């Protein structure tokens, strides 16, 4: 079967934003204008096509990113047929993991901002994630029909708060209820949308006289930005003072792909004014799979050997599983992004991370929640594979003959835990199965059994995250559960450096004995430039002359890591530890891996007396938006919660207070902040860093460990 759309006419994009910027409505309009949906779904009716889980429809927020395949020929039919794969991403902080993993497999992003509230804390998080993966993006300032909407103010905020260079390619005509259309700065025409066909078509007219000067001014800065793309364009611009439409687009495209600029457009998705031009901008400025760098990876046999795959059907097959979803009809769906090669249904692939072969039963492409069965996928495609037995988010599925492990995704450590138990004993096993499936879908959610109490503990990124997990257990798996009080994920670290400790484990009482002996130097690991402490262990080997044979070194590392889980002060896991093994001895007969593991574990245990341990608590970055009348109460309350106020600013929606507050003080804050402000304040919170906990909290924790 030949390729139906050439790969240079593919666009794999995500629509990202903070809560309530109108992202799902924008995605809905994209599906409508590209001909997939004949009835518009509105989020506030609970009818949006991409929000296909029941909770999403009830809460009106998007939780799982659904991948949708659409086609676009341009707002005026000016292009050949382009295949646009859209991934809808959630905007709620508790689901940043979803955003992170969709950005990992995208080539470009449309970042949606609200014309009234502009750059919000969540937008900064999404922007940082997009920077991390080097994702080219365009900006769509939505909700221009809302009170207080101002396109150029949001453009200015992007520059100041996100440190990026936005280049408007449009201006808004009118604002709030008088918002009627846009000025196209490339064609220098005014665009007015047709209400009769829900904004499918528009008419072009002369620019209104009162906007002429402003349009000229912004056009010249746009042309200048395009000219800076390369010498050829710059020379032409300097000689003639002008560039053609095609040259402007080419210059802007080159600079967008290099992540130097961000083209900015505006509109109102809800009022059907502007989304077709957002799609045009996707085609004009965002990359095809062939225009992004080859994807890097390593050889499964030797992780020091680097390898890469280009977006080409002739290269060996490689793909990344970026999402696992459970479907009521077909079982497990594995969403995969194909980077190279071709895969047909019935083929076998290698899961190179787990070293297992899997047979692909069927493959489907999603059009929101309808699916179309397909026979093959090629480089650049995004599809859902059915019949995978053991695949986790972030696994590589590739050719068996030419295997590769693509770069893994980083998943954050959970910061909050609760004990969960089924309402009836009969549901115990069912609950275990349900939690196992949910953990396979969502790598930022963990399940473990507390060895002492035998309770099942679930951990996640925030209260909302865990609420939704419990809710899904009830709806999808029919398991009702009671949950305990939230527990904070405390950590511990040491304060002393260069503490040298001897670990010796000897059992020699006739017959085959045990002998392990090592000297380890412990220090606090370096923190990064933001003051964040490294999560795991930094391990180094400085043993010379074979006093400890090489094959026992991994056992020493394992012994340290296992003991780190037990902490040194109050039994919480140890982080930010650097350990260097530098001496020791062994016995020809009695030494084995187990003995060295125990010796290292014994040495680590002594840090409790010698390492100057301290307890760390998670600190959250909290941003509260409140009307001015309640500002005093909100700030007083944050101070009572041991919050450090970082700054304040005025916005259209009220005063914004930024603070860093320990997570342990934030439980139930959603209810408290609402009652303090008569329901008018809202807040968002994300993990910032670990910091030392005050002595009264440490005493209580030590007492609790008893």
Swiss-Prot record:
<dbReference type="InterPro" id="IPR000795">
    <property type="entry name" value="T_Tr_GTP-bd_dom"/>
</dbReference>
<dbReference type="InterPro" id="IPR014721">
    <property type="entry name" value="Ribsml_uS5_D2-typ_fold_subgr"/>
</dbReference>
<dbReference type="GO" id="GO:0003746">
    <property type="term" value="F:translation elongation factor activity"/>
</dbReference>
<dbReference type="InterPro" id="IPR047872">
    <property type="entry name" value="EFG_IV"/>
</dbReference>
<feature type="binding site">
    <location>
        <begin position="142"/>
        <end position="145"/>
    </location>
    <ligand>
        <name>GTP</name>
    </ligand>
</feature>
<keyword id="KW-0648">Protein biosynthesis</keyword>
<dbReference type="GO" id="GO:0003924">
    <property type="term" value="F:GTPase activity"/>
</dbReference>
<dbReference type="InterPro" id="IPR035649">
    <property type="entry name" value="EFG_V"/>
</dbReference>
<dbReference type="InterPro" id="IPR000640">
    <property type="entry name" value="EFG_V-like"/>
</dbReference>
<dbReference type="InterPro" id="IPR005225">
    <property type="entry name" value="Small_GTP-bd"/>
</dbReference>
<dbReference type="GO" id="GO:0097216">
    <property type="term" value="F:guanosine tetraphosphate binding"/>
</dbReference>
<dbReference type="Pfam" id="PF00679">
    <property type="entry name" value="EFG_C"/>
</dbReference>
<keyword id="KW-0251">Elongation factor</keyword>
<dbReference type="GO" id="GO:0005525">
    <property type="term" value="F:GTP binding"/>
</dbReference>
<dbReference type="InterPro" id="IPR009000">
    <property type="entry name" value="Transl_B-barrel_sf"/>
</dbReference>
<dbReference type="InterPro" id="IPR031157">
    <property type="entry name" value="G_TR_CS"/>
</dbReference>
<dbReference type="InterPro" id="IPR004161">
    <property type="entry name" value="EFTu-like_2"/>
</dbReference>
<feature type="domain" description="tr-type G">
    <location>
        <begin position="8"/>
        <end position="290"/>
    </location>
</feature>
<dbReference type="InterPro" id="IPR041095">
    <property type="entry name" value="EFG_II"/>
</dbReference>
<dbReference type="InterPro" id="IPR020568">
    <property type="entry name" value="Ribosomal_Su5_D2-typ_SF"/>
</dbReference>
<keyword id="KW-0547">Nucleotide-binding</keyword>
<keyword id="KW-0342">GTP-binding</keyword>
<keyword id="KW-0963">Cytoplasm</keyword>
<dbReference type="GO" id="GO:0032790">
    <property type="term" value="P:ribosome disassembly"/>
</dbReference>
<dbReference type="InterPro" id="IPR004540">
    <property type="entry name" value="Transl_elong_EFG/EF2"/>
</dbReference>
<dbReference type="Pfam" id="PF03764">
    <property type="entry name" value="EFG_IV"/>
</dbReference>
<comment type="similarity">
    <text>Belongs to the TRAFAC class translation factor GTPase superfamily. Classic translation factor GTPase family. EF-G/EF-2 subfamily.</text>
</comment>
<dbReference type="GO" id="GO:0005829">
    <property type="term" value="C:cytosol"/>
</dbReference>
<dbReference type="InterPro" id="IPR035647">
    <property type="entry name" value="EFG_III/V"/>
</dbReference>
<dbReference type="InterPro" id="IPR005517">
    <property type="entry name" value="Transl_elong_EFG/EF2_IV"/>
</dbReference>
<dbReference type="Pfam" id="PF00009">
    <property type="entry name" value="GTP_EFTU"/>
</dbReference>
<protein>
    <recommendedName>
        <fullName>Elongation factor G 1</fullName>
    </recommendedName>
</protein>
<comment type="function">
    <text>Catalyzes the GTP-dependent ribosomal translocation step during translation elongation. During this step, the ribosome changes from the pre-translocational (PRE) to the post-translocational (POST) state as the newly formed A-site-bound peptidyl-tRNA and P-site-bound deacylated tRNA move to the P and E sites, respectively. Catalyzes the coordinated movement of the two tRNA molecules, the mRNA and conformational changes in the ribosome.</text>
</comment>
<dbReference type="Pfam" id="PF03144">
    <property type="entry name" value="GTP_EFTU_D2"/>
</dbReference>
<dbReference type="InterPro" id="IPR027417">
    <property type="entry name" value="P-loop_NTPase"/>
</dbReference>
<feature type="binding site">
    <location>
        <begin position="17"/>
        <end position="24"/>
    </location>
    <ligand>
        <name>GTP</name>
    </ligand>
</feature>
<dbReference type="Pfam" id="PF14492">
    <property type="entry name" value="EFG_III"/>
</dbReference>
<feature type="binding site">
    <location>
        <begin position="88"/>
        <end position="92"/>
    </location>
    <ligand>
        <name>GTP</name>
    </ligand>
</feature>
<dbReference type="InterPro" id="IPR009022">
    <property type="entry name" value="EFG_III"/>
</dbReference>
